[in-house]
């Protein structure tokens, strides 16, 4: 169990490094590269650099809020 | 304030010989108690440490008290003291009552359910002497430390809980919710009287208050082993309760 947990943790860290690198390149470096360069085909149009994180944030906060709300309602009912 | 604390400590510890009191709050620990006492005595006698154990028994229905009394006959009343209380009254009051019975100038708090191994106590003491600090805490989140017997979900919750608490409260300690710690007795008394939290947040508040009062906290990596007998669980209500009380602490500490 310990070894597989370590593996999952390792994958999570790798994923985080990849996302950080990719996003930084996309948002900070690609605007300075000519638009018909071959590397541009690996990145979405730039406005998605704002849209995707925003959607993730809203979904995440909603999920946490719903979880907290549900638990609070449940604990109130038990009383 | 902190400089005053430091100077009176160094003068007292150089004159008197250090004695360590281990406070063990118990509730339904009849299987674990003989093992933990045996481990404490072998580990500490190996290092020639002057110690005593105060068992704070909260009227367990499984006869933990009788087991404690038999152990007292074996190890002697010098080494084992028993405090029998009428029922569960919370961790803070168990420690406070334990302190009143203690004769040592240092106090070690640990769980009696075998999740904390007494072999780390000599390391705590060594760390304290080296740093000349008032508190030493065992940490699961430094290299060399860890958790055994938890699934990934439980590990993640514990990590995230610690992360949230340390971001909000910035106490400068890596393991906030741990409960295996060494305190100078007067420091522990002072911290407990100020502490208003319960459960996991009780341990968090101890560290936050210590930081606020300018006490230095040393850290020793420990391996935590989840309880072998009995169950420990974490439901969603507990998670929300933790968040609420951390937030509460955040609001009330300036």
UniProtKB/Swiss-Prot annotation, chain A:
BP GO annotations: dolichol phosphate mannose biosynthetic process; GPI anchor biosynthetic process; protein glycosylation
Membrane-crossing residue ranges in chain numbering: 8-28, 50-70
Membrane topology term: Multi-pass membrane protein
Pathway(s) it belongs to: Protein modification; protein glycosylation
Keyword annotations from UniProtKB, A to Z: Endoplasmic reticulum, Membrane, Transmembrane, Transmembrane helix
Family annotation (Pfam families): DPM2
Compartments, as annotated in UniProt: Endoplasmic reticulum membrane
GO cellular component: dolichol-phosphate-mannose synthase complex; endoplasmic reticulum membrane
GO MF: enzyme regulator activity
Source organism, top-level taxon: Eukaryota
Keyword Transmembrane helix annotated: yes
Keyword ATP-binding applies: no
Function noted in UniProt: Regulates the biosynthesis of dolichol phosphate-mannose. Regulatory subunit of the dolichol-phosphate mannose (DPM) synthase complex; essential for the ER localization and stable expression of dpm1.
Homology family: Belongs to the DPM2 family.
Subunit note: Component of the dolichol-phosphate mannose (DPM) synthase complex composed of dpm1, dpm2 and dpm3.
Protein name as it appears in the record: Dolichol phosphate-mannose biosynthesis regulatory protein
Organism: Dictyostelium discoideum
Gene of this entry: dpm2-1
From Swiss-Prot, chain B:
Free-text remark on how the cofactor is bound: Binds 1 divalent metal cation.
Binding residue positions for Mg(2+): 113
Cross-referenced InterPro entries: DPM1-like, Glyco_trans_2-like, Nucleotide-diphossugar_trans
Broad class of where this protein is predominantly found: endoplasmic reticulum
Source organism superkingdom: Eukaryota
Signal peptide extent: none
Gene3D superfamilies for the chain: Spore Coat Polysaccharide Biosynthesis Protein SpsA, Chain A
Annotated GO CC locations: endoplasmic reticulum; endoplasmic reticulum membrane
Gene Ontology biological process terms, A to Z: dolichol phosphate mannose biosynthetic process; dolichol-linked oligosaccharide biosynthetic process; GPI anchor biosynthetic process; protein mannosylation; protein O-linked mannosylation
Gene Ontology molecular function, alphabetical: dolichyl-phosphate beta-D-mannosyltransferase activity; dolichyl-phosphate-mannose-protein mannosyltransferase activity; metal ion binding
Biological pathway: Protein modification; protein glycosylation
Binding site for GDP-alpha-D-mannose: 25, 27, 29, 56, 58, 111-113, 140, 227
Enzyme Commission number(s) of this protein: 2.4.1.83
Catalytic activity of the protein: a di-trans,poly-cis-dolichyl phosphate + GDP-alpha-D-mannose = a di-trans,poly-cis-dolichyl beta-D-mannosyl phosphate + GDP
Required cofactor names: Mg(2+); Mn(2+); Ca(2+)
Compartment annotation: Endoplasmic reticulum
Keywords: Endoplasmic reticulum, Glycosyltransferase, Magnesium, Manganese, Metal-binding, Transferase
Residues noted as binding Mn(2+) in the record, renumbered to the chain: 113
The protein's assembly and partners: Component of the dolichol-phosphate mannose (DPM) synthase complex composed of dpm1, dpm2 and dpm3.
Family: Belongs to the glycosyltransferase 2 family.
Stated role: Transfers mannose from GDP-mannose to dolichol monophosphate to form dolichol phosphate mannose (Dol-P-Man) which is the mannosyl donor in pathways leading to N-glycosylation, glycosyl phosphatidylinositol membrane anchoring, and O-mannosylation of proteins; catalytic subunit of the dolichol-phosphate mannose (DPM) synthase complex.
Name the record gives this protein: Dolichol-phosphate mannosyltransferase subunit 1
The species this protein was found in: Dictyostelium discoideum
Originating gene: dpm1
């Amino acid at each position: 169990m310990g070894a597989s947990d370590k593996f999952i943790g390792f994958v999570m860290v790798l994923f985080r490094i990849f996302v950080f690198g990719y996003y930084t390149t996309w948002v900070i470096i690609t605007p300075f590269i000519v638009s018909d360069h071959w590397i541009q085909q690996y990145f979405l149009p730039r406005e998605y650099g704002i849209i995707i994180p925003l959607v993730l944030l809203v979904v995440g906060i909603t999920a946490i809020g719903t979880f907290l709300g549900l638990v609070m309602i449940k604990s109130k009912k038990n009383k | 304030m902190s400089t005053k604390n430091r100077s009176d400590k160094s003068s007292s510890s150089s004159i008197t010989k250090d004695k360590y009191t281990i406070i063990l709050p118990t509730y339904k620990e009849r299987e674990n108690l003989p093992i933990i006492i045996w481990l404490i005595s072998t580990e500490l006698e190996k290092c020639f440490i002057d110690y005593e154990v105060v068992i704070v028994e909260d009227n367990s229905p499984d006869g933990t008290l009788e087991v404690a009394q038999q152990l007292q006959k074996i190890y002697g009343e010098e080494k084992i003291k028993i405090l029998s209380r009428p029922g569960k009254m919370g961790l803070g009051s168990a420690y406070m009552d334990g302190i009143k019975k203690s004769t040592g100038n240092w106090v070690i708090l640990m769980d009696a359910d075998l999740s904390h191994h007494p072999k780390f106590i000599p390391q705590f003491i060594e760390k304290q002497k080296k740093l000349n600090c008032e508190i030493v805490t065992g940490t699961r989140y430094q290299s060399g430390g860890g958790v055994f017997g938890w699934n990934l979900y439980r590990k993640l919750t514990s990590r995230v809980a610690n992360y949230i608490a340390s971001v909000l409260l910035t106490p400068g300690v890596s393991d906030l919710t741990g409960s295996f710690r060494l305190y100078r007795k007067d420091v522990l008394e002072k911290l407990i009287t100020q502490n208003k939290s319960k459960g996991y947040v009780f341990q968090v508040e101890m560290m936050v208050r210590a930081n606020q009062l300018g006490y230095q906290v040393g850290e020793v990596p420990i391996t935590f082993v989840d309880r072998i007998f009995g169950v420990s669980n974490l439901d969603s209500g507990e998670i929300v309760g933790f968040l609420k009380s951390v937030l509460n602490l955040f609001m009330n500490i300036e």
